[in-house]
Design a protein with these regions (language model features):
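Nucleotide-activated sugar donor-binding and catalytic core shared by glycosyltransferases
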Residues: 1-405
């Protein structure tokens, strides 16, 4: 751990620079810089429970759990400005939402002293050695929710694996996503008696059925969500090859990229407008870029179909269950390793279309745009698949209730 602390301090100028860049580029502001180094301006509300959800995906998973325990006093920390904005928009005002400090001893201890939580719930895969060590030293229970360990983490260098082992030694309990994740946690050093496989919270029957009301657009559109660099151009090419069947709406994974995306697509001769500048796109618009936060569900619900990004580039995919739970036809690319269980489940139920290469993306885009019967078949299959899911959110609520009561 001493070597880890020394390395962090040696890297502190670089980490400060990266934090400053992120604050400016991603709209975090001064609060992002201050809190990432453990300085919290507001007086402590003494929340009992601390949830940590690194980015947008983890925040979305945590929202129903946080809502269930908000009366007990909840602090939610995030790593990114986008996740912070989503949490502030979706959660009630009595939930404290802040940025998580970097893993410096001083920064971590300032947060722990400021809020004095009794339990820490980490969503998915955030194993921070210093944070876990300091929380354990203060006898704060550490729990991992929907624990996931990917192949890359399992194949980490020996030095990194040693740090993971040290972090996992401090963990009170891990609720793993799947048996394979449970095995990987154990291989990294998690004691067998402190882990069980509870199921993937993403594969949980939604509690509030029905589509969001009041569509944000009056014109038909196809939708691409959670896109990454280079995906927007590939999607636009597929959409053009399909004959520009309707308006193309793109919601990038990181909204601050929208200006650059608009320029890149405009250079290809496409007319682009951003939602932050044009709440209603002009009729001449080819591509409408949604650079706002908290509107994905509405755009999904009223789209013709939904392409889920992070899958045309080796990111590993994003949450294909979100549009499926809204009864939409779902299209994805080949890179879905982080969403394997969800993609497999929808595939087994004939509720997803997968483009294995770029020219196939164009043909599937065209078919989804023109073959109403096939699109409706995918929608019906998605609804049936979702109806069969267990209520894993409730299972996790029960697990959390047992350890805090």
């Amino acid at each position: 751990m001493l070597l880890y602390d020394l390395l962090l301090h040696l890297l502190s100028p670089l980490l400060l620079l990266l934090t400053l860049i992120d604050a400016k580029r991603r709209g975090g502001g001064f609060a992002f810089i201050r809190e990432r180094f453990g300085f919290f301006k507001r007086s402590p509300a003494n929340p009992r429970l601390w949830f940590h959800a690194a980015s947008i995906g983890e925040v979305q998973l945590a929202l129903p759990l946080i809502a269930a325990f908000s009366s007990k006093g909840v602090l939610l920390t995030c790593n990114t400005p986008e996740a912070f904005r989503l949490a502030k928009k979706q959660l009630s005002a009595d939930v404290e939402v802040h940025f998580c400090p970097l893993d410096f001893s001083g920064a971590v201890n300032r947060l722990l002293s400021h809020y004095q939580p009794s339990a820490l719930f980490v969503v998915e895969t955030e194993l921070w050695p210093r944070l876990f060590a300091e929380a354990h030293r203060r006898r704060i229970g550490i729990f991992i929710i929907n624990g996931r360990i990917g192949h890359k983490t399992s194949a980490s260098p020996r030095f990194i694996k040693k740090l993971y082992r040290q972090a996992l030694a401090q963990v009170t309990y891990v609720w793993a996503r799947e048996p394979i994740d449970q095995q990987r946690f154990i291989a990294l050093g998690c004691p067998e008696e402190r882990i069980s496989s509870v199921g993937d919270i993403k594969l949980s029957r939604p509690e509030n059925a029905g589509l969001p009301t009041s569509p944000l657009l009056s014109t038909p559109y196809s939708l691409a969500i959670s896109t990454h660099h280079d995906e927007e151009q590939r999607i636009a090419r597929a959409w053009m090859a399909a004959g520009k069947p309707n308006l193309l709406v793109i919601i990038p994974r990181h909204p601050p990229r929208a200006a650059n995306i608009a320029k890149e697509l405009a250079d290809k001769g496409l007319i682009c407008h951003r939602r932050s500048e044009s709440p209603i796109p002009p009729k001449s618009t080819d591509v409408y870029l949604v650079d706002t936060v908290g509107e994905v569900a509405n755009f999904c619900a009223h789209s013709e179909f939904v392409f889920v990004g992070g899958s045309l580039v080796p990111v590993g995919g994003h949450n294909v269950m979100e549009p499926a739970m809204l009864g939409k036809a779902v299209l994805t690319g080949p890179h879905t390793i982080t969403q394997g269980s969800a993609v497999d489940y929808l595939s087994e139920n004939n509720a997803i279309a997968i483009a294995t290469k770029e020219d196939e993306l164009a043909s599937l885009w065209q078919r989804l745009s023109t073959d109403n019967a096939w699109r409706q078949q995918l929608e019906a299959s998605a609804k049936r698949a979702i109806d069969k899911l267990p209520d894993r959110v409730q299972i996790y609520r029960e697990q959390i209730s047992r350890v805090i009561d």
